[in-house]
A protein has these predicted regions:
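Solvent-exposed, flexible loop/coil residues
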Residues: 105, 109, 140-142, 195, ...
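An internal, acidic/charged active-site-proximal segment
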Residues: 147-241
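Basic, short loop/linker segments at the boundary and entry of helix-turn-helix/winged-helix-like folds
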Residues: 1-20, 147, 151, 155
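Active-site-proximal, Lys/Arg-enriched surface segment
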Residues: 55-138, 150
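Short, charged/polar micro-motifs that form catalytic or ligand-binding hotspots
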Residues: 24-28, 40, 107-111, 158-161, ...
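Electropositive nucleic-acid engagement tracts
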Residues: 7-22, 26, 30-96, 197, ...
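Electropositive, glycine- and tryptophan-enriched low-complexity nucleic-acid-binding patches
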Residues: 48-53, 108-182
Length: 241
């Protein structure tokens, strides 16, 4: 954590230990990852300070991820087969207060469940990959409820519904803007079946390799339309009106 402690210096106060405790709790033995379980797993942590850190501490997630992405790029980026991997993940929840939670399909469980959904971007090379960006999906009915968004403390500029395809494309553009070096974008059929998404990736000067539906029709060569050969038979006689 020492390499990232500068991100947790808030108004002259160092809260990096709370960040370390929270991270240790997320990686801990308890299945549930609420603050009570995290505090139980990390008994030396300060519960009240940990709650303050998670709820109100104004450290910048974006600045932290920029540093993480830059370090990952130095290891996995800039190679001929460096690729940006797009995928989704679900986080099962019990209540209805977590940002973006609703009953929706959870790919991890293969069924509908009360959960959050996120779109993730990883920089990969061969068998190695590391997270460089992520977006939390905000369902439309959440975006249409200012009171719910206010209660959940969602920043005003993020209180809009965007499709997962839009979130993914935004992360591809952000990765390029941050200087990450990759030539390929990889994703599953949720993205590969969108002609618009594939075309937008190609417009960014990138190659893509994505899963497609079993029913998808593709050309194995550039199709060239041609005129049909003229028929030897004479057409229908003209009709006089």
């Amino acid at each position: 954590m020492s390499d990232y402690s500068a991100h947790f210096l808030i108004r002259g106060k160092d809260v990096s230990q709370h960040a370390a405790d929270y991270l240790s709790g997320l990686l801990g033995t308890y299945r549930r990852k609420n603050l009570e379980c995290i505090h139980g797993d990390i008994p030396e942590s300060n519960y009240q300070a940990l709650q303050q850190f998670v709820s109100d501490s104004p450290w910048s997630q974006d600045k932290l991820m920029i540093q993480v992405a830059g370090e990952v790029n130095g290891i996995l980026g800039g190679k001929p087969h460096s690729a940006l991997l797009i995928d989704e993940s679900c986080f099962v929840k019990k209540g209805d207060h977590s940002v973006g939670v609703q009953r929706q399909f959870c790919g991890r469980l293969g069924k509908k469940e009360n959960c959050q959904r996120g779109v993730l971007a990883c920089l990969g090379l061969g068998e190695k990959a590391s997270l460089v960006d992520f977006r939390l999906f905000l369902p439309e009915w959440w975006a249409q409820s200012p009171e719910r968004c206010e209660k959940a403390q969602i920043p005003r500029e993020q209180r809009q519904h965007r499709s997962k395809l839009e979130l993914a494309l935004d992360m591809v553009k952000t990765a390029q803007a941050r200087g990450l070096q990759f030539s390929w974008v990889l994703a599953d059929s949720a993205y590969g079946c969108s002609n618009e998404f594939c075309a937008d990736v190609e417009k960014l000067g990138l190659y893509y390799m994505m899963d497609a539906s079993m029913k998808a029709c593709v050309w194995d060569a550039d199709p060239r339309p041609s005129l049909p050969a003229p028929s030897a038979k004479r057409g229908r006689p003209h009709t006089v009106w």
